[in-house]
Amino acid sequence: MWFKNCMVYRVNREIEFNADQLEKQLAEFRYTPCGSQDKQKFGWVSAMGRHGDMMTHVSEDRILICAKKEEKMLPASVIKESLNTKVEAMEAQEGRPLKKKEKETLKEEIIIDLLPRAFSRSNHTYVLILPKEGFILVDASSYKKAEDVLALLRKTMGSLPVVPAIPEKAVETTLTEWVKTGQTPQGFHLLDEAELKSVLEDGGIIRCKKQELTSDEILSHIAADKVVTKLALNWQERLEFVLADDASIKRLKFSDELRDQNDDIPREDQAARFDADFSLMCGELSAFLPNLFQALGGLPHPNA
């Protein structure tokens, strides 16, 4: 449940998040397994998994929900090989090349035949709603995956006025300044990893790990018109993360000191541990995110 990534969206119009109402709405779009001819299924599951029956998990006004996507695995190479075999056989039999539409029909028949025997791949994506802060957080590795889940939530709720939380000032400009000067806002510290890209279209990319970021070597790249597009940071010795120029937060790691605070809860009481960990994570993110966006120069006005 601890988020590993954080795609941050902000609510840009007035909307009420009612946990009881949302519970009913999510149930209407509950995940059901793929049937024999389904290529994929996408729906909501219990936020606590097998440890809870409710679709939502709520602490104060914060709401956690979870989407599950199941996809049938049909390798393109398998479909292509089957199609080529059938096309060759039919063209030999009829003594003429098949038309494009005939090949497309054959391909659909092959997919229909393979689907019932295809393996499935499933993944879960958590969404955290922070009404007081006006944020919706998606634990996804890309904005594309986050948008897919938010599209499902928008369909579920009927309306979801959110936009990516992108600071007014270009993130890469701020990150470059931090590395160039070696100075970061209070509470933030540079770690030893970064990515720099040339401002020229055909310029190079430098990726460095276990590197002193304020060294002459790194500064020479900045002097040669490269900007920092990814930067590993520490916040108050409680969070480590990699911030990208699109404001996405990856490889989010909560400190052991924080995560160990609930070790007094018996391991067999997993529901209680889940709830306690959720409260800890929410408290941390509720403090961290406003601090981060303030450090990045602030977000534009919601109606801007």
Curated annotation (Swiss-Prot):
Alphabetical list of InterPro entries matching this protein: RdgC
* This protein's UniProt keywords: Cytoplasm, DNA recombination
A family per Pfam:
RdgC
Gene Ontology CC annotations of this record: bacterial nucleoid; cytoplasm
One of its GO biological process terms is: regulation of DNA recombination
- Tell me the superkingdom of the source: Bacteria
Report a single Gene Ontology molecular function. double-stranded DNA binding
Keyword Protein biosynthesis annotated: no
Give compartment(s).
Answer: Cytoplasm, Nucleoid
Q: Which PANTHER family match?
A: RECOMBINATION-ASSOCIATED PROTEIN RDGC
Family label: Belongs to the RdgC family.
Role noted for this protein: May be involved in recombination.
Question: NCBIfam families recorded for this chain?
Answer: PRK00321.1-3, PRK00321.1-5
Q: What is this protein called?
A: Recombination-associated protein RdgC
| Species of origin | Vibrio vulnificus (strain YJ016)
Q: Which gene is this protein's source?
A: rdgC
